Amino acid sequence: MPVQGSQRRLLGSLNSTPTATPRLGLAANQTGARCLEVSIPDGLFLSLGLVSLVENVLVVVAIARNRNLHSPMYCFICCLALSDLLVSGSNMLETAVILLLEAGALAARAAAVQQLDNVIDVITYSSMLSSLCFLGAIAVDRYISIFYALRYHSIVTLRRAWRVVAAIWVASVLFSTLFIAYCNHAAVLLCLVVFFLAMLVLMAVLYVHMLARACQHAQGIAQLHKRQRPAHQGVGLKGAATLTILLGIFFLCWGPFFLHLTLVVLCPQHPTCSCIFKNFNLFLTLIICNAIIDPLIYAFRSQELRRTLKKVLLCSW
């Protein structure tokens, strides 16, 4: 990863020897001060990546097998699963190669390792960017389906959805390539941070507006049936809880990584920031956790998808 704190892990593994590190401990930063460092065991990292990989493969297979799921909404969900799959797979590949290099089971020249590192970085960052974009696309799709229900099928067509998908993938690959090439430029890192904040604000505004519409709808039904206010309050509380969980998971899983990028620009040499940089692998692990949670939030809640997945699993046996 071309970000301070990762220190080109593949290249560094060529001349390194494996050392046992505690999962949670105190480490000395550049000034000798003590700071908290969370070390993620390789076995745990690979296990989380494998869980994410299996989950998202199942989502992609289920959507591909069922023609009823070939709609714009499921198109975005499928692409989100594919992005999360690539995030997990690329990080697992990098970790596996590092372990093989450190164990001496894999011999490679520095130039070859450099090229492999660049390829993995492009895949990782492009899939991260596309994952964020598809989360935003899903929010926009749901917003249109609620506020423009009668015109939804004319606004959000499958052809337009595929154009959006193609644009997201092309933009993600191009920007990630630029990011790898100019990772030491503050402007590039700040663009990534601004992009994350823009996605966070977009999702928050759209989902809050949808929650307000749901509360108004519930209030109208309650008045129609002459119910009391608590029924409306129950809908509001349930919706608020769902919204808090959705945005909270998004912020907690992605926020630390983009905080890392922000601090790389603002205080690359400060002792406190140096302590945070030491937890870069923890921030990557949180993104892997988000890739595990995404199918639970956006895919597996669909009864149609669950039925298809059940059929696929039964047929495989």
Curated annotation (Swiss-Prot):
It is found in: Cell membrane. SUPFAM superfamilies: Family A G protein-coupled receptor-like. GO terms for biological process: adenylate cyclase-activating G protein-coupled receptor signaling pathway. A lipid is attached at residue 315 (S-palmitoyl cysteine). Residues 1-37, 94-118, 184-191, 267-279 are extracellular. It is a multi-pass membrane protein. GO terms for cellular component: plasma membrane. Glycans are attached at residue 29. InterPro entries: GPCR_Rhodpsn, GPCR_Rhodpsn_7TM, Melcrt_ACTH_rcpt, MSH_rcpt. It comes from the Eukaryota. One of its GO terms (molecular function) is melanocyte-stimulating hormone receptor activity. The keyword Nucleotide-binding does not apply. Residues 64-72, 141-163, 212-240, 301-317 are cytoplasmic. The chain crosses the membrane at residues 38-63, 73-93, 119-140, 164-183, 192-211, 241-266, 280-300. Keywords: Cell membrane, G-protein coupled receptor, Glycoprotein, Lipoprotein, Membrane, Palmitate, Receptor, Transducer, Transmembrane, Transmembrane helix. Receptor for MSH (alpha, beta and gamma) and ACTH. The activity of this receptor is mediated by G proteins which activate adenylate cyclase. Mediates melanogenesis, the production of eumelanin (black/brown) and phaeomelanin (red/yellow), via regulation of cAMP signaling in melanocytes. Belongs to the G-protein coupled receptor 1 family. Interacts with MGRN1, but does not undergo MGRN1-mediated ubiquitination; this interaction competes with GNAS-binding and thus inhibits agonist-induced cAMP production. Interacts with OPN3; the interaction results in a decrease in MC1R-mediated cAMP signaling and ultimately a decrease in melanin production in melanocytes. This is Melanocyte-stimulating hormone receptor. The gene is MC1R.
